[in-house]
Amino acid sequence: MQVFWFIPTHGDSRYLGTSEGAREVSFDYLKQVAVAADTLGYEGVLIPTGRSCEDPWVAASALAAVTQRLKFLVAVRPGLMAPTLAARMAATFDRISNGRLLINLVTGGDTAELEGDGLFLDHTARYEASAEFLRIWRQVLAASHDGDKVDYEGKHLSVKGATVLYPPLQQPHPPVYFGGSSAPAHALAGEQVDTYLTWGEPPADVAQKLDDVRRQAARHGRTVKFGIRLHVIVRETEAAAWAAADDLISRLDDETVARAQAVFAKMDSEGQRRMAALHAGGARRTREALEISPNLWAGVGLVRGGAGTALVGDPHTVAERMREYAELGIDTFVLSGYPHLEEAYRFAELVFPLLPRSVRDKLPGKVLSGPFGEVMATGIVPRAAQS
């Protein structure tokens, strides 16, 4: 099991739907979150992409320089960047970060955002272009290790003599992650990606999606790994966790929710449609209305696009829910919580010790009793100075 955290390059807050308690997007703050994730034992971090975010490649490059082992899941955007250029960027980042790059292929589903960036393809064409983009990207990086060039002619993209002179550290290329809920998305995942990501839906719905991607992969003689994107609200007791969930949306009003849902409804995204269906428009903002599966809460999606569900509960309950997803085949958990700095610590301290050994082995040090009886948070004892 791998556990990732999230870098909030679009801002952070204690509450959803209001500027109250909001934090400015600054490099100092993003650095705090990244260093915390690195120190606490998270496998990596997701860097979001889109017009509401800082540029993911610039942000990830800066944060790679202040972390040691943390991996960075960074977006490439078919239609908004050339595949050979994206391959060159990936190879350079992978080398300077000592092999810490992961690629997040983002087709996009916000029509207004895509058109603002100059992309006017419909849903089907976007996935066709994404498939061609990824074929070129993978071939160019694989060929770079031998100094070869690539020719490719497709419906949307073509290259002649494409090459990357300085290959990535990871072979044949950094692993590719990808999420999408439509049939074309599953076909693309089965053909080319390494890890398929789903947003946090109830386990039965997730199982159906994973089975479909497995069938698509089998058509190409491949296997695919799986990950899930979730928010987390964990406290020492169930009651405290649900109180924190209520507090997170306590500043929302009907107008704010309706305005956000109207924006989401215009998106050309099957995943966003499925997220919206979980809370039925948010007319009722009670636990009974928003707990769509045991401890799976749809309150975040009332005003946040994309991943809109959270695991809510005490440490043992949240760990058990994660194990239920793992039994379906989920290997990677990409998590976040508001505010991201404090919740990175809280989740790691409360839940990491309950997860499989692959996670526990990354914990920073042991808990010992110090010489005066106090509990120390590290197993490293400084040696006395030598005269």
Swiss-Prot record:
User: What EC number(s) are associated with this protein in UniProt?
Assistant: 1.14.14.5
Which segments cross the bilayer? none
Enzyme's top EC category? oxidoreductase
In terms of domain of life, where is this protein from?
A: Bacteria
Alphabetized GO MF terms: alkanesulfonate monooxygenase activity
Q: Does the keyword Flavoprotein apply?
A: yes
Q: Quote the catalytic activity from the record.
A: an alkanesulfonate + FMNH2 + O2 = an aldehyde + FMN + sulfite + H2O + 2 H(+)
Does the record's keyword annotation contain Ubl conjugation? no
Which Pfam families does the UniProt entry name for this protein? Bac_luciferase (PF00296)
GO BP terms: namely: alkanesulfonate catabolic process
User: What are the protein's UniProt keywords?
Assistant: Flavoprotein, FMN, Monooxygenase, Oxidoreductase
Tell me the InterPro entries matching this sequence.
Alkanesulphonate_mOase_FMN-dep (IPR019911), Luciferase-like_dom (IPR011251), Luciferase-like_sf (IPR036661), SsuD_RutA_monooxygenase (IPR050172)
Q: Which family does it belong to?
A: Belongs to the SsuD family.
Q: What does this protein do?
A: Catalyzes the desulfonation of aliphatic sulfonates.
Mind telling me which PANTHER family this protein's record contains? ALKANESULFONATE MONOOXYGENASE, ALKANESULFONATE MONOOXYGENASE-RELATED
**Entry-linked NCBIfam families:** alk_sulf_monoox (TIGR03565), PRK00719.1 (NF001939)
Mind telling me what this protein is named? Answer: Alkanesulfonate monooxygenase
Source species = Cupriavidus necator (strain ATCC 17699 / DSM 428 / KCTC 22496 / NCIMB 10442 / H16 / Stanier 337)
In the UniProt record, what gene is named as encoding this protein? ssuD
